[in-house]
Amino acid sequence: MTVIQSSTVIDVQNASYCIVIYASGNWRSLSLPNGIGILGRWSLLCSIDLELRPSDRHNTPPVAIMISPRFIPVGISQTIIVPTMDADNDQVRCRFANTTAECASVCPPNSLPIGTIMFPNCTLLITGSNVADWYAVAIVIEDFIDSTASLPLSTIPVQFLINVQQKSSCPYRPLLTGPTTSSDQCIGIKVGTSFNIELIAENFCPNSTIIKDIAILSFRFLTKTPIVQNTTALWSVLLTWTPAAVQVGSQILCAIAIDSDNVQSNQYCMSFIVAVERVPSCPGQIIPTTVDPTTLTTADYITSTIADSTTPTTVDYTTASEYTDEYVLSI
């Protein structure tokens, strides 16, 4: 499975600040809020500050993406990290969406199980209540000029689905790795330069279990080969990408391996900075795929009572482009 981002370019002139809202429906049938069923609407709000920074250049908003849906086993607390990147190296914080314009029918706390936590470092802790439950997660990513700032420079929504599944008989999930040693590394790349990425999925379960897919959430101009079994335990795909001029700025690629028991691997992500003239340096980094307990503070908690029902839609998120005066609304 490969999910491609689509973009709408909006030319903003003679404005210092603007808000872009995309609202429609419907989500697929959801388990929460109680009784929502197939009536869930979505709304995504992106705020854009067009005033010059102290460096006399426009702000570059953060980029964030998520593979959707994410499968989690019932009754087991799960940690899900939302990969983010900010080309200005601003402080990036995450929170739950909290207004009708930001989340429509799926605003927390009623849209998620009790005890769900969203930490400012973009770490989500969630425990699925019932097998076959579907939840829509509505998160807002914001960048701040420094750690003391309270007003964000921009607001970027990320919305994705979670599906609760029966526990697998095998206690191990697949491991997905790539060319970088960890997902907090950034790669500079020049427009027109071909770049190959081999993703390798390892199976730790009995031989009856296989890796059936390596799913990718990618940008344009990227190709993917069919999945290949290399050994009894290893499968791989090869990605090839030649960035175009329209991709100048920050890009994030994410992937997940899925085995024949429908168990998902870790989400593996790579971040890129694209430039026209030369290979650029990387001023920002994406959130690491390991959790530092010392950073899990001042979280958003879900403490309301809940019930259940059924299922949601596709990955929906909004980003604004980088290094230009145009902003791109990606859904």
What are these regions (language model features)?
Residues M1-P288:
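Long, compositionally biased, intrinsically disordered segments
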Residues D143, D259, E277-I331:
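Extracellular mucin-like PTS segments
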